[in-house]
Amino acid sequence: QSLAKLENKKEFRKKTKELCEEGKEINFWYDEETLQEINPVKHTFIGGCYIRELFMPKDQLAVTKIHKQDNPFFIMKGSLSFLNEDGWLHIKAPYHGLTKVGTQRIMYIHEDTVFITVHSTDSKTIKDAESKIFAEDFNDPVITEEDLNTLKNNI
């Protein structure tokens, strides 16, 4: 990654945080209970993997969690667009891709979508697994270490 890309990443993170905060102020985002009803998640643990199968209804705008580890994802049904620091990506099922450490996306769901992620973990509970794979914010040591490595590689 170049230093310019790192700056772009920081700007995207800042704008995404502002979007989330402004959305909370005007009650744009769903509360956790409603979100679980609208976006049910099927959780599976097997062979050192935590698999999350998420349903996302048409016309939903969502901001993903911040990822602390690399993982594959699969779009099994539907279509969506997401925005990250690299720009817009339009996806139609079937599709698979990779999520990198520090990724957070703004997503718009065009059609009812089934989104699956697979995470390597020795966790046996949802709470423990999520604490290992998702960061509360970009100040998480795993995320900042990734950014520091980018800086070191460009100096």
Residue ranges: model-predicted function:
Residues 1-53, 141-155:
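A short, N-terminal "cap"/entry segment at the start of jelly-roll beta-barrel domains
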Residues 47-68:
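Conserved short histidine dyad/triad with adjacent acidic residue
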Residues 60, 95, 103, 111-113:
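Surface-exposed loop/turn positions
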Residues 67-86:
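Glycine- and acidic-residue-biased ligand/ion/polar-headgroup-sensing regions
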Residues 72, 79, 104, 112-114:
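Structural motif
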Residues 84-106:
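Short acidic-glycine-tyrosine-enriched beta hairpin
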Residues 110-155:
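Double-stranded beta-helix
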